[in-house]
Structures are given as structure tokens and as C-alpha cells.
Amino acid sequence: MRGSVLLLIDLQKAIDHPDWGVRNNPSAENEISRLLARWRTENWPVWHVRHDSSEPASHYRPGQPWNDFKPEAAPLHGEPVIAKRTNNAFIGTGLEQRLREGGHTSLVVAGVITNNSVETTVRMAGNLGFNTYLVADGCFTFGRLDWNGQARSADEVHAMSLANLHGEYCTVVSAAELLEAFL
């Protein structure tokens, strides 16, 4: 896992808008900050994915403040920023090509929303053959209604998304497990 690309997905101010509702993992940003500090100290690659929506009403629309990165996850000079317009960081972005050209074969993924952009990106990474680790406590989501109209909590949605991914597309780990593995 040493030297894996830390891929941070959609950590923008828009995710804090009250329209989203109640989220899980309130300390996700702290875990992401710990990972970022380690990656930067070790000079390992940190890549940022930014969602740029073309929808006029979206909080992720470029050119307005909600589209900015959250301060605790803002890119430093020289850290690549991958702009995407879909929920998958590989679609239409050149991400796969850039990773392969750089000789990167392993990813550590954190960000939002677990069951949306994180899940679709991790599935694609696994399908493309990247050795992928998903940081469970470095992601979060929101409650939603299932197809039957039953309310599902953010914790339930998050857990199911992780279950969908673990073992087939990635290895789900905690930030502490990941950081301990590097000691």
C-alpha cells in the first residue's frame, strides 16, 4: 500500500449544504486529514476529484462558492485535480490514462458520497484492475428512501455500499488500519 495514490473524491463545500440532510461519519474529515498529513509527509501521491455539475441548480456548479474544495481537503500546489461531470471519476476525465502513465497500480479512496461517486469510482477502479482500498471512516453518505419508500439511515446506506464493494472491487479498511500498516 505504500506509495498508493490517495484519491479524494468530491470533498467540496457543497456536501455541507443543509439540503443533503443527516449524514453519518461526522469525523470523516478528521480521518481524511490524518491520511492527507501522512501522504504529504511521505511525499506519496495525492489526487483530488472535483465534481463540476452542469445542472444550473446544483451546488456543485463551477464558479460559485459551494463548488470550492473544503479547506481540510484542499489540494496543495502540484497535487492533480481531476474534474468530472458524472458520478464516476473515470468517465470522461482521463483518470485511468494518467494513473497508468504514472505507473500507479494501487489506490486508497476516501470522500463522498459513499453510495454514489465513491461507489461508482471504486467499482470502476476494481474492474480496471487497480488494487483499491476504500477507507470506511473516510467516507460518508446521507439517509434516503429505498425503492419501497422505506427510510434508510445514513449508517445503513453506508454499510450496504461498503458491503457491495468489499472483497470484489476493493478492500474496505479503516483509516487507523491503513496508517498502522505503514508503520
Spans of model-derived segments:
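Short beta-strand segments at enzyme active-site cores
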Residues: L8, W44-H51, V135
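A short alpha/beta connector and helix-capping loop motif
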Residues: W20-H48
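Alpha-helical bundle segments that constitute or directly flank the non-heme di-iron/ferroxidase center
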Residues: L6, K13
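Small-residue-rich anion-binding loops in enzyme active sites
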Residues: E55
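Short acidic, Gly/Ser-rich segments with clustered Asp/Glu that frequently serve as metal-coordination loops
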Residues: A14-P18
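Active-site-adjacent betaalpha module
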Residues: M1-V5, E31-E42, H59-L183
